[in-house]
Amino acid sequence: MKVELCSFSGYKIYPGHGRRYARTDGKVFQFLNAKCESAFLSKRNPRQINWTVLYRRKHKKGQSEEIQKKRTRRAVKFQRAITGASLADIMAKRNQKPEVRKAQREQAIRAAKEAKKAKQASKKTAMAAAKAPTKAAPKQKIVKPVKVSAPRVGGKR
């Protein structure tokens, strides 16, 4: 038993029922009844007609049993090692007392400042050494030989 689908309403058409409509371009449509056929021929949109399957699908009618509650993904905190530091090292640092951590931070800052000062001092000495030889040898002015030419002969120009 072959069951067709109505081209307009979307309902099943059982054998012995419905009408077939062949357009001049060769496309064939099956309609459940004259109501569907007349609605199709008057160019009505099945998505805007309440009783059609397309309307019910568009407006989500009659699907309440199938809908499951959407599960939201929850972010789970996970601790793992980072490159250059193992998990044990990270946990040890985290469990340190704040005073110890503060002292370590200050010591690191002090060391960085000292290194910066040393770098600047070495830079200063290098600059002073570079400047000294330039002052010792001043350049002498080159005297260009003046070309003595014969007196000009002629008029104004």
Swiss-Prot record:
Annotated compartments: Cytoplasm
Keyword Ubl conjugation: yes
Record's compositionally biased regions (Low complexity): 123-140
Residue positions where N6-succinyllysine is found in the record: K131
Gene Ontology biological process terms, A to Z: cytoplasmic translation; exit from mitosis; optic nerve development; retina development in camera-type eye; retinal ganglion cell axon guidance; ribosomal large subunit assembly; translation
Residues modified to Phosphoserine: S86, S149
Region (Disordered): 106-157
Protein's recorded name: Large ribosomal subunit protein eL24
Organism: Homo sapiens (Human)
